[in-house]
């Protein structure tokens, strides 16, 4: 079946989802969760085949870890669907309303996008998360995962489709595109009029390709060259703890800090304990000459280092002369994801927040908090680094648009 045919089926399914009740959608989510647990052995067999093929192809340990499933991970994925069912349904929510002078009742309400396309890399959990959040928000979804997870995704989507159909909603609410050819990606990116929005989740190269080549509207997510700036008025112990957590709590996420900027006034106090903490955690520091004075283990930082989203046990560190210099550095190298300042100065915090252009700005907190769950939004489809249509963690409301409903009693203009 071609991508166009799948997209047409998705549009038909989306029409049914648009009028489905919350009870209908929540029942489908619970059925999906139960089916994943019941058919775990089938899913793990497919995943085992993907892992074996990946090892033969020389995939890195990090990629294999993201690809791997076990019974515990499948149970966690199922639990995430149940938690999704407990979240409020965004569709039909009244965003604003008023009675006009002529007596017309005006309401702006949330409605589903319709058909959402998602292109992503070797994370089978994204297959289920994306299917769940799209269904909950009333959208049909077209999933295009990576070839390295092809067998796992086929098994997962088979389970999900059977479960959805068993509750009376269309099986075509969830569809998987062929991952063995790049043609499916090209067709999906050009299915304007059939696909309402495209969301890429993955590395910089994937996101750049989709943004540059798609004719379907795109919500750009993900790439995070995040900074922690330690201000002249920072508490040293707090600064070291935040920098260490932001870098090492999890290395391979888009909200992980990749750069540490330290005001020259506190460099001698902050850098020795910070460098020692990074060394103890196995993190390689790429630093400017002022940083290298404090440790022979520091590697020289290049312009490329400052621009790199490492997603590994590496961090670039630079000493800056002022808050102005820190902001200028972030403007040059940042990706608009998450930036943090550590300071006891309210005026410095206000200035940093006002001047830094990012989806999230942290004051005396780790960059790792930029997350739908941590923000209390529940499920998220990704973290948008653009300004239209959504910015920051994208929860259920961000997978909707709005329509105006005007109710009258025979008014004429």
UniProtKB/Swiss-Prot annotation:
Keywords carried by this UniProt record: Amino-acid biosynthesis, Cytoplasm, NADP, Oxidoreductase, Proline biosynthesis
The primary location reported for this protein is: cytoplasm
Keyword presence, Cytoplasm:
yes
Q: For this protein, what is the EC number? A: 1.2.1.41
Q: What does it do?
A: Catalyzes the NADPH-dependent reduction of L-glutamate 5-phosphate into L-glutamate 5-semialdehyde and phosphate. The product spontaneously undergoes cyclization to form 1-pyrroline-5-carboxylate.
Gene Ontology terms, MF aspect: glutamate-5-semialdehyde dehydrogenase activity; NADP binding
List localization entries.
Answer: Cytoplasm
CDD domains tied to this protein: ALDH_F18-19_ProA-GPR
Regarding protein family, the annotation reads: Belongs to the gamma-glutamyl phosphate reductase family.
Q: Name one GO biological process term.
A: L-proline biosynthetic process
Question: What pathway does the annotation place this protein in?
Answer: Amino-acid biosynthesis; L-proline biosynthesis; L-glutamate 5-semialdehyde from L-glutamate: step 2/2
GO cellular component assignments:
cytoplasm
Which Pfam families does the record match to this protein?
Answer: Aldedh (PF00171)
The catalysed reaction is:
L-glutamate 5-semialdehyde + phosphate + NADP(+) = L-glutamyl 5-phosphate + NADPH + H(+)
Q: Which organism is it from?
A: Salinispora tropica (strain ATCC BAA-916 / DSM 44818 / JCM 13857 / NBRC 105044 / CNB-440)
Query: What protein does this entry describe?
Result: Gamma-glutamyl phosphate reductase
What InterPro entries does the database record attribute to this sequence?
Answer: Ald_DH/histidinol_DH (IPR016161), Ald_DH_C (IPR016163), Ald_DH_N (IPR016162), Aldehyde_DH_dom (IPR015590), G-glutamylP_reductase_CS (IPR020593), Glu-5-SA_DH (IPR012134), GPR_dom (IPR000965)
Has the keyword Acetylation been applied to this entry? no
């Amino acid at each position: 079946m071609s991508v166009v045919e799948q997209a047409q089926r998705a549009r038909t399914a989306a029409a049914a989802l648009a009028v489905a009740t919350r009870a209908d959608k929540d029942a489908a989510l619970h059925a999906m969760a139960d089916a994943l647990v019941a058919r775990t052995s089938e899913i793990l067999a497919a995943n085992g085949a993907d892992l074996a093929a990946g090892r033969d192809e020389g995939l890195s340990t990090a990629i294999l870890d993201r690809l791997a499933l076990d019974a515990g991970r499948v149970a966690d994925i199922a639990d995430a669907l149940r938690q999704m069912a407990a979240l409020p349904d965004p569709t039909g929510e009244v965003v604003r309303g008023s009675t006009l002078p002529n007596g017309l009742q005006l309401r702006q309400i949330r409605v589903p996008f319709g058909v959402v396309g998602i292109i992503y890399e070797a994370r089978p959990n994204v297959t289920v998360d994306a299917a769940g959040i799209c269904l909950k928000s009333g959208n049909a979804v077209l999933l295009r995962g990576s070839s390295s997870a092809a067998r796992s995704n086929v098994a997962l989507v088979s389970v999900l489709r059977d479960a959805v159909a068993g509750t009376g909603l269309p099986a075509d609410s969830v569809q998987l595109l062929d991952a063995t050819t790049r043609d499916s990606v090209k067709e999906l990116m050009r299915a304007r009029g059939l696909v309402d929005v495209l969301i890429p989740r993955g590395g910089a190269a994937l996101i750049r390709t989709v943004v540059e080549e798609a004719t379907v509207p795109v919500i750009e997510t993900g790439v995070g060259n995040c900074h922690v700036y330690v201000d002249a008025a920072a508490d040293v112990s707090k600064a070291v703890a935040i920098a260490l957590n932001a870098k090492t709590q999890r290395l391979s996420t888009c909200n992980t800090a990749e750069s540490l900027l330290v005001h020259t006034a506190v460099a001698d106090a902050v850098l020795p304990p910070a460098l020692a903490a990074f060394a103890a955690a196995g993190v390689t520091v790429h630093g400017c000459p002022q940083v290298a004075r404090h440790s022979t283990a520091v590697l020289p930082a290049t312009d490329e280092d400052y621009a790199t989203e490492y997603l590994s046990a590496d961090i670039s560190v630079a000493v800056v002369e002022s808050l102005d210099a820190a902001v200028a550095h972030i403007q040059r190298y940042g990706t608009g994801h998450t930036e943090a300042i550590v300071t006891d100065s309210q005026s410095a915090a206000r200035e940093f927040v006002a001047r830094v252009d990012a989806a999230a700005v942290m004051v005396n907190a780790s960059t790792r908090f930029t997350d739908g769950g941590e923000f209390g939004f529940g499920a998220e489809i990704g973290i948008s680094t653009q300004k239209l249509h959504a910015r920051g963690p994208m929860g259920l409301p961000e997978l909707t648009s709005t329509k105006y409903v005007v109710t009258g009693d025979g008014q004429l203009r």
